[in-house]
Amino acid sequence: MPEPAKSAPAPKKGSKKAVTKAQKKDGKKRKRSRKESYSVYVYKVLKQVHPDTGISSKAMGIMNSFVNDIFERIAGEASRLAHYNKRSTITSREIQTAVRLLLPGELAKHAVSEGTKAVTKYTSSK
């Protein structure tokens, strides 16, 4: 009588290594879909502001959700502004106006100045 086929040994319980590829029945390997997030950028900004402070994965999830929400609001408002002015392109001017409309007082001023600085840096590096 033939011996039953042995399956691969189960990983140790304390193993921390993440499995990057899922095993299919026919032996082919399938890559997992990549989940895009702003976590790398949130972490970089955190280290600029508070070098000795860390962030939990739950807090990072909240920050990621926050950035996505603000992005959608600004993009939506900029789209509306372009539509009102019969334009088919969203420019930095629409983004700037959208930020002024969405963010309150001093926060809008700081956001506009940082945005202008970023656009200037980008255009000068081209």
Curated annotation (Swiss-Prot):
Glycans are attached at residue 113. The lineage of its organism: Eukaryota, Metazoa, Chordata, Craniata, Vertebrata. The modification N6,N6-dimethyllysine is found at residue 58. The gene is H2BC4. The modification N6,N6,N6-trimethyllysine is found at residue 86. This is Histone H2B type 1-C/E/F/G/I. The modification N6-methyllysine is found at residues 47, 109. Residues 1-36 are annotated as: Disordered. Its main location: nucleus. Signal peptide: none annotated.
